[in-house]
Regions:
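Bacterial Sec-dependent N-terminal signal peptides
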Residues: 1-33
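Periodic small-residue-enriched repeat registers in elongated scaffold domains
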Residues: 30-477
Length: 477
């Protein structure tokens, strides 16, 4: 088919469609009193069909009421449309195409960008190859897209889908309702999310990604640190490389992590996992429920533990560590001095390098050790092991049950023994060594004099022991 014959056929089809259109719609413009015209337009190979139409461009068509197809290869169809650029189409009512190869279809749409499309009602496509579909959308930059109602795609290669989304950063995307993006390479999905930094992501409801490559996912999360992630409900991040996952966690230290419910990680590299934990110092850790790690390298694991000293460790329930490098493990233990250790239940290690292991033991002097139940050691370098032993002397020891040693370098082994003398010993049951350098060994013995010994059963050492030679030994002169 020759070009002229094909054009005549297309013209007849347009006239036929135009006649049908007017018969059904009453010319789409209310009461129209002028007679419809079906004729050639003023442009070469152009056609006008309807009332008050103008087809002045080459190969143009103006069909309906008060339409204008001015530029070559353009079409204006409907009512009050203007196709003012080459290869453009304005179809519907009050549409305007100002850029080549653009399309405005619907009502009140405008295209200003080459190759752009505005389809629906009151949409504007200003950018090169931009698209605005729906109602009152604007695609202002090249390769931008706005779909839905009241969306604004203001950055290059941006997309806004949904309702009242605003995207001004290049290569960014917003999906949902009232999301705002003002940075490049960002994503906002959901409702009322905000991204203001490059590479940020806010997904869910009322989230804010305020720093470069930050992520806020869920509801009411806030991420202001670079490369940070706030995921869940009401999490808050204010430092770089930090993470908050769960419900109402706060991570304010660089590279800190808060995971669970209402945890706080405010120290550099601090970690708080669980419920209501606090890791407030650099490299501190709090795991479990209501634990606190408040000094550098401190660790609190379990429930209601407090690690308040440098490199201190509190593990279990209600343990407290206030001495540097100290440890409290179990239930209700306290380690309050340098390198002190309290392990078990309700033990206290308050001396430097002290150790209290078991139940209700107290090691209150430097290098003191208490093992067992209810032992109390107040002497330096002293040790008590067993049940309810009590030591007050330095370098002393008590092993057994309810022994008491109150002087230096003394020892009590057995049950209910008492040693109050210096460098003295009581071994057995209910023995007393009250003099210095004395020994009471056996049952109910008492060594009271200096260097005295009472050995056996209910003996009294009232004088120092002396050497007595055998009677057959002849004394030398």
């Amino acid at each position: 088919m020759s070009k002229s014959k094909r054009y005549q056929l297309e013209k007849k089809i347009i006239v036929f469609l135009s006649s049908s259109l007017f018969a059904i719609s009453g010319f789409c413009a209310g009461d129209v009193y002028a007679a419809a015209v079906f004729a050639d337009g003023t442009g070469t190979n152009s056609t006008v069909a309807g009332v008050n139409n103008n087809a002045s461009g080459e190969n143009t068509n103006a069909v309906g009421y008060n339409n204008h197809a001015i530029s070559d290869n353009s079409n204006a169809i409907g009512a009050n449309n203007q196709a003012l650029a080459e290869d453009s189409n304005a179809i519907g009512s009050k549409n305007n195409t100002y850029a080549n190869e653009s399309n405005a279809i619907g009502s009140g749409n405008i295209t200003n960008g080459i190759g752009s499309n505005a389809i629906g009602k009151d949409n504007v496509a200003n950018g090169l190859d931009s698209n605005a579909f729906g109602t009152a959308n604007k695609a202002n930059s090249d390769n931008s897209n706005a779909f839905g109602t009241g969306n604004l795609a203001d950055g290059i290669s941006t997309s806004a889908f949904g309702y009242l989304n605003n995207v001004s950063g290049n290569e960014s995307v917003a999906f949902g309702f009232t999301n705002t993006i003002s940075a490049a390479e960002a994503v906002a999905m959901g409702r009322n999310n905000q991204v203001i930094a490059t590479g940020g992501s806010a997904i869910g409801n009322n989230n804010q990604a305020m720093a470069m490559y930050s992520t806020a996912i869920g509801n009411d999360n806030y991420a202001i640190g670079e490369n940070s992630s706030a995921i869940g409900l009401g999490n808050n991040i204010t430092a770089n490389d930090a993470t908050a996952l769960g419900n109402k966690n706060t991570a304010s230290g660089i590279s800190a992590g808060a995971v669970g419910i209402s945890n706080t990680a405010s120290g550099h590299n601090a970690q708080a996992f669980g419920y209501l934990n606090e890791a407030t110092a650099q490299d501190s850790q709090a795991f479990g429920a209501q634990n606190k790690a408040t000094e550098r390298y401190a660790s609190a694991f379990g429930h209601e533990n407090e690690a308040k000293a440098y490199a201190g460790s509190a593990l279990g329930v209600k343990n407290v560590v206030t001495g540097d490098f100290g440890s409290a493990v179990g239930y209700d233990n306290t380690a309050s001095n340098y390198l002190a250790n309290a392990i078990g239940t309700s033990n206290v290690a308050s001396g430097a390098y002290a150790n209290a292991y078991g139940v209700y033991n107290e090691a209150t002097a430097s290098y003191a050790s208490a093992f067992g139940y209810g032992n109390k050691v107040g002497g330096e370098h002293a040790i008590a092991s067993g049940y309810n032993n009590n030591i007050a002397g330095n370098f002393a020891s008590a092993f057994g049950t309810e022994n008491t040693v109150s002087n230096i370098r003394s020892a009590a082994v057995g049950s209910n023994n008492t040693v109050s003398g210096e460098i003295s010993n009581a071994f057995g049951y209910n023995n007393t060594a009250s003099g210095n350098y004395t020994n009471a060994i056996g049952y109910n013995n008492q060594a009271q004099a200096f260097a005295a010994s009472a050995i056996g059963y209910q003996n009294r050492g009232l004088r120092p022991a002396r050497f007595r030679p055998a009677p057959w030994v002849v004394p030398t002169k």
